[in-house]
Amino acid sequence: MEFWSELQSYQSLRRLLELASARTSSCWRFIFGSTLTNVIYRAKEDYSSRFAELLSFNPGIFASLNLGHHSFFQEIVIKNLDFSSPGRTVSGLAFICFILDQWSAQTHLSEGYTLDYMTMALWRTLLRRKRVLGCSPAQPPHGLDPVREEEEEEEEEENLRAGLDPQTEL
């Protein structure tokens, strides 16, 4: 499954979280959602008891989010998400959707704000990790990516005489 393309932009990530959350009906998710949306929703439902257990260790997360103290959430949840493999990425997205559902159910804040906040926190983390790794977290390092190799071959074909011209010294 090539899912990294769905995480490339803020709008597509926001739509993905919205469609995988509980606020979207299963009919709407089936018709307008992607395979990744359904996989994330299924993972969220299957592991909801484990996610609830993880959140029970830090009961102040929702209170701090409601008060606008987002650094606690960043330190406890966001920094511990792992996007090193496709499975871990799906489980991280499912956990964020679970938190979004729980937070939306018990907050006075609008659903748009909660969705935007979760999307922005996740988006910033993905951008930061992409910048640090030099590649997308779910993609192999440089030299192992077949798409990049094809692009490099096309560039070489366009510039066939690059190595044949004699060097000129100035």
From Swiss-Prot:
Keywords: Apoptosis, Early protein, Host cell membrane, Host membrane, Host nucleus, Host-virus interaction, Inhibition of host apoptosis by viral BCL2-like protein, Membrane, Modulation of host cell apoptosis by virus
Keyword Membrane listed: yes
Acidic residues bias locations: 148-158
Annotated compartments: Host cell membrane; Host nucleus envelope; Host nucleus lamina
Keyword Nucleotide-binding found: no
Highest rank taxon of the organism: Viruses
Main location: host cell
Region (Disordered): 137-170
Coiled-coil segments on the chain, per record: none
Any single Gene Ontology cellular-component annotation: membrane
Biological process, per Gene Ontology: symbiont-mediated suppression of host apoptosis
Transmembrane feature ranges: none
Family: Belongs to the adenoviridae E1B 19 kDa protein family.
Role according to the record: Putative adenovirus Bcl-2 homolog that inhibits apoptosis induced by TNF or FAS pathways, as well as p53-mediated apoptosis. Without E1B 19K function, virus production is compromised because of premature death of host cell. Interacts with Bax protein in cell lysates.
Protein name stated in the entry: E1B protein, small T-antigen
Protein species of origin: Human adenovirus F serotype 41
